[in-house]
Amino acid sequence: MMELPLCGRGLILSLIFLLLKLSAAEIPLSVQQVPTIVKQSYVQVAFPFDEYFQIECEAKGNPEPIFSWTKDDKPFDLSDPRIIAANNSGTFKIPNEGHISHFQGKYRCFASNRLGTAVSEEIEFIVPGVPKFPKEKIEPIDVEEGDSIVLPCNPPKGLPPLHIYWMNIELEHIEQDERVYMSQRGDLYFANVEENDSRNDYCCFAAFPKLRTIVQKMPMKLTVNSSNSIKQRKPKLLLPPAQMGSLSAKTVLKGDTLLLECFAEGLPTPHIQWSKPGSELPEGRATIEVHEKTLKIENISYQDRGNYRCTANNLLGKASHDFHVTVEEPPRWKKKPQSAVYSTGSSGILLCEAEGEPQPTIKWRLNGLPIEKHPFPGDFMFPREISFTNLLPNHTGVYQCEASNIHGTILANANIDVIDVIPLIKTKNEENYATVVGYSAFLHCEYFASPKATVVWEVADETHPLEGDRYHTHENGTLEIYRTTEEDAGSYSCWVDNAMGKAVITANLDIRNATKLRVSPKNPRIPKSHVLELYCESQCDSHLKHSLKLSWSKDGEAFEMNGTEDGRIVIDGAYLTISNITAEDQGVYSCSAQTSLDSTSEKTQVTVLGVPDPPGNLHLSERQNRSVRLSWEAGDDHNSKISEYIVEFEGNREEPGKWEELTRVQGEETDVVLSLAPYVRYQFRVTAVNEVGRSHASLPSDHHETPPAAPDKNPQNIRVQASQPKEMIIKWEPLKSMEQNGPGLEYKVSWKPQGAPEEWEEEIVTNHTLRVMTPTVYAPYDVKVQAINQLGSSPDPQPVTLYSGEDYPSTAPVIQRVDVMNSTLVKVTWSSIPKETVHGLLRGYQINWWKTKSLLDGRTHPKEVNILRFSGQRNSGMVPSLDPFSEFHLTVLAYNSKGAGPESEPYIFQTPEGVPEQPSFLKVIKVDKDTATLSWGLPKKLNGNLTGYLLQYQIINDTYELGELNEINVTTPSKSSWHLSNLNSTTKYKFYLRACTSRGCGKPISEEGATLGEGSKGIRKITEGVNVTQKIHPVEVLVPGAEHIVHLMTKNWGDNDSIFQDVIETRGREYAGLYDDISTQGWFIGLMCAIALLTLILLTICFVKRNRGGKYSVKEKEDLHPDPEVQSAKDETFGEYSDSDEKPLKGSLRSLNRNMQPTESADSLVEYGEGDQSIFNEDGSFIGAYTGAKEKGSVESNGSSTATFPLRA
C-alpha cells in the first residue's frame, strides 16, 4: 500500500466520514453480505456443579456462514466426540463428564462465507482445580513474651475471589487489633505476643465462593513463654518486608481498587499512619481500614499516581516505607472501526484507535489473516486507518482491528460490503398511521440502497413532492409532518430512487382530535381539616377512549391509583379526594391524560388555609398612668391574610385569671396604644384573626400596673322598685371592678321632691340599693347616685326622675252606653276616672261580662266571667264572640301598675237573633229511580227562633262538575225529612241543607246520593251496626225468612264504603233441623277457616291502602269560612280578653260559602250521624244511613261513593 501526504488526508477523511454516514445501514439478509458475529461467550468457568459448559458463537450473513474454532491459536475440531456441536451454529457444549481440564484454554470463533470471515473476541475457558492445602506436619512454635511472630497461611491457588479466615477448632475467629493483623496473603502477624496468645489450634481457612469450597490448613501450636524482663523496642516494618528497602513499586489498573498494607513489630505496639508526600489523599475515595494497617483507594485514576507513605510510631521511635504507585490500563477503544456499505467505484476509510497504558499496538487483519497478505492497488494503510479508493466488489470482506498491550487484547470486526442494488424498502406497504391535531406525524419509509438513494414524499395521486417548512424527510426515509391539522389526513407515497432503480410504498395517515383536560375547582383555597375533591374532566377522541388513562400527581410525584394514607387520599378515576386536609397537602396538583397517540396535563394550585400562628414577642413601651404601647410580631398567616388582632387583658381583682377583650387592631398593624383604667395590674395577650378563624392566644406580656384615682363615671340604669304605697326602693347598676379606679368604693344617694326648694337628702351606702319612704303616693322625685372612693368622687351626676309607690285606683268608671253592633258584637262606652283617683300611672281599662240567660228558652246561665283589657287612656271598646239571642251583664274598671280599682254598676243588655248553626246531620235514607228521601237533625245552636230550612240540590258527575242549583224552602220548623221527586234516574246528586231564623240561614251541611236505574229497588236504612274485633260475630235480631244485606266496613272510613257485602236470608225454625249438625262437619270447619283467613287478608290490604291517604281535620276546613257577622267588625280595635280563668273565649268564627269545592263534601263521621246514636259505641262505627254502596269488592281512596246498587228487602 502507498502512503498519502498529510495535507490531503484531512479532505479525504471528511469525504469518507460523509460517505460512511450516508452508507452505513443495516443490510437486509436478502442481500448478499459478509458474516457478522451477533453473539459470543467471553469468560466461561467450568464449575463442578454444572451439567455442561456452553461456549457460544452465533453469526449472520448471506450466504449463510460456516463456523470454525481455534484453541490457543491452534485449530480446534468441532467434530470431537467429547463435545456437542449445534447445527448451523458455532456454539458447542462441553459435558461435565470425567476430566475436562484439557479443554482449558483461549478460544476464537471464525464465521465465514465466500465474501469474508468474521472473528470473535478471545473466549477463555477456565477449568479450576480443587484447591487443597498440602498435607504437612507443622512444628510447634515457641516464642518469648513480647517477641513478634508471623504464622504463615500459604493458601492454595483457586478461582478468585479468595477469602481467608483465621479461626480455632471451635470455628471462633481470631480477633484482630493493632497488635494482631492478617495480611492480604493470609499470614497472621503479631507485633508482640502475650501469654494469652498461646493456643494449639491456630487454623487458616481459605474460602472460594464461586467453587462453593472452604479448605483448612493443619492447626498450628503457638506457645508464649513468660518473661521477667520484657524489653521495649522501636518499630520495625514486617510489611512490606525489610528486604524491599524503604521504597517499593506497585502497579494498579485504572478503575480498580488500590490496596496498600503496612505492619510493624515493636513494643509498645506501633501505630500506623498513612500520607501522600506533597499531596493529600484522594478525598471521598481513600479509606484507612483494619486498624490503620491498610490504605484503600477506590476507582483509581491517573491522578492517583505517585508515592504513598506508611509510618509506624511508638514511644521509642518510628519506621516508614514509601510505595511508588503506577497506574496502567488495558486497551480500550477510542475509535472503533465501523461497518459500512459502499457502491462500486466509491471511496472509504476505516479508523481504529485504542488507548491504554502502555500504549496499545494496532494490527489489521482481513478475514482473520494479516492484511499484508491481501494488498489492493491504490489503497493506503496507516497505523490507525485504512483508506480505500475506487472500491471494487473484491474489497468486500471482514476487517479486524486488534489492539494489544501487556494487560490484554481487544478485537473489533468491521464489515466492508461493496454492493450495487436497487432500493429495497423495508417498511410495509399501506401502513396505517395516526396522530392528533397539533402533534407531529411520522410516516416511515425505511430502506436499503447502494449506491446512495434519494427519498421523495408525495401526496398520493399527486405528482409534486411535499414542500414547506412543516414537512421534513429524515435520513432514514421517515417523513415528519409538524403541527398537523385535520387537512393532513390522507394517503402519502414514498419514492426511493438511486442509479440502479426506484421503489415506492403508500402510507395512510388519520388525524384524531387532541385530548383536553379541565381540572375543577381551579386553584382552590381550602381550610385545614376540610375535604378537598378535585375533578378532572376529559374530552377525548372516540377512537382513543379505549386507551385513555388518567393519573394524578402532586408537585411532580405521582399518586398510587388505589389511594394512600389509609384511605385519606382516594383516587377514583377522574376524582381525587383528600379528607382531613393538612398543610402538607398544599401544592400543585396535576391531572394527566395518556392515550395511545397523545398526552396532556392540567394543573391546579391547592392552597391550604389555616388559622394564624399566635403573635410573638409581645413588648410594652411608652408606659403612662392611663396608657401603654403594646407591640408584637405577626405569626405565620397560613395563606389567609390576617384581618385583625384582638388585644385582651387580665387584671380584674375580683376575677383573677379572666381575660377580657380590650380592643381590636387592623391586620396590617403590629402595635397599638392602649387606654387603661387606674388601679389595675394589667397583663396583655394578642390573638390573630383571619378568614379561617382565630389563632391561639399569644404568651402573656409583662405586667403593667396603673396608680389609683377617683372614679371617672357614675352608676347607670338608676330605677325604682316599690311594693308598698309611698315606698321608693332605689336601685342601680354597680360599677365594675375595672371602673372603681381605687380602693374603698361607696355610693352617695341624693333625693328630693321634684320642683321643691328643699335641700337634698343624702345617704352613703356600700351596696347598690336603698329604701326610702315618702309622704305621698306616686310623687315624682329627683334622684342622683354618685360613686366615691378613697381618692375622691366621680363627676356630679345628672338627676333622674323616679316616682314613689302606687296605690289601687279609688273610683270606678261610669258606663254611658252599650251599642249592639250585631248578634255577637257590642261596643261599650264609659267615662274616664279622675286623675287624682288613679293613685299611680293609669295602665288602662278592663271590661268584665257574663251571660245570664238565653232568650230562646228563658233558662238562666251560670255566671262565667269573661275579661277583656284595653291599654292606655281610652273610653270605649268592642266585645266580640257573644252568643246571639241572649242576655248579658257588663262592668268596667280602671287599673294601674298596682292593680285594678272598683267595678262600675252592672250594665244589662241583650243580643238579637242570629243565624243558626248547620243541621246536626243530613242523610239520604231512601232513593228510587227518580225520588229520594232526606232526613236531618236540628242544629246544636239555633241562635234564635227557627223559621224553617233551605234545601238545595244539584247534579254532579264523576269529575265533580256541578249542575244547576235547585232550591226548596221548608217553612215548617219542626219538619225533619223531605221527599224529593222528579229526579233523573241513575244520576248522582249533591244535597245542601241550611237552618234559618228571621236573621237568615246558617251554614249548610251537604250529602251526596245517586238515584237508581230501571227495575232497581230502593236502599233501606241500616238498622244496626256493631263494632267487632273478632272474625265471627253472631247477630240474633234478624227476622226469620227475610233477606238482609250485610256490610263489612273499617271504622275509620268517612264515606261509608264497604269492603265486603253479601245478601243473606234468615231461616225459620222449621229449617233448623236440616243444619243442626253441620257445624260439626270437617269440611264446614275447613271452609270457615279459609273464609276467615281470606277476610283477614282483605282487611290488612284495605287498612294499608286507606292509611296511605293521610288524615285531615274537619275543623280546619270549617275555620276557612268565618262568620260574616263577625267579619264586618274587624275594623274595630279589640282588646286582650279572657274568662275568669284567663282562658280563651269559647266558640269559633264561621261563614257560609255557597261555592264550596266538591272535595268539601267528605266531612267527618259525626256529620253523618242521625239523631239516635245509642246503637253505636264511642268509636262512631257504623254511623248513620247509607246513600249507596260500592260495587262488590271495590275500594276507592278519594273519600266519596259514586256507584250504588239496590238492597233486597
Swiss-Prot record:
Q: What is this protein called?
A: Neural cell adhesion molecule L1-like protein
User: Ig-like C2-type domain spans which residues?
Assistant: 35-124, 128-223, 235-328, 331-417, 423-510, 515-607
Q: Tissue expression, per UniProt?
A: Expressed in the brain, in the cerebellum and in the spinal cord. Detected in the retina and the optic nerve. Expressed in neurons and glial cells in the central nervous system and by Schwann cells in the peripheral nervous system.
Q: Does the keyword Secreted apply?
A: yes
Ranges of Basic and acidic residues composition bias in the record: 1115-1133
Q: Summarize the PTM comment.
A: Cleavage by metalloprotease ADAM8 in the extracellular part generates 2 soluble forms (125 kDa and 165 kDa) in vitro and is inhibited by metalloprotease inhibitors. In brain extracts, these two soluble forms are also present and are dramatically reduced in mice lacking ADAM8. Cleaved by BACE1. N-glycosylated. Contains N-linked oligosaccharides with a sulfated carbohydrate structure type HNK-1 (SO4-3-GlcUABeta1,3GalBeta1,4GlcNAc).
Residue spans, topological domain Cytoplasmic: 1105-1209
Q: Which family does it belong to?
A: Belongs to the immunoglobulin superfamily. L1/neurofascin/NgCAM family.
* Effect ascribed to mutating residue 1186 to A: Inhibition of migration potentiation
Q: Which residues form the Fibronectin type-III domain?
A: 614-709, 714-807, 812-914, 918-1015
Assembly and oligomerization: May interact with L1CAM. May interact with ITGB1/ITGA1 heterodimer and ITGB1/ITGA2 heterodimer as well as with ANK3.
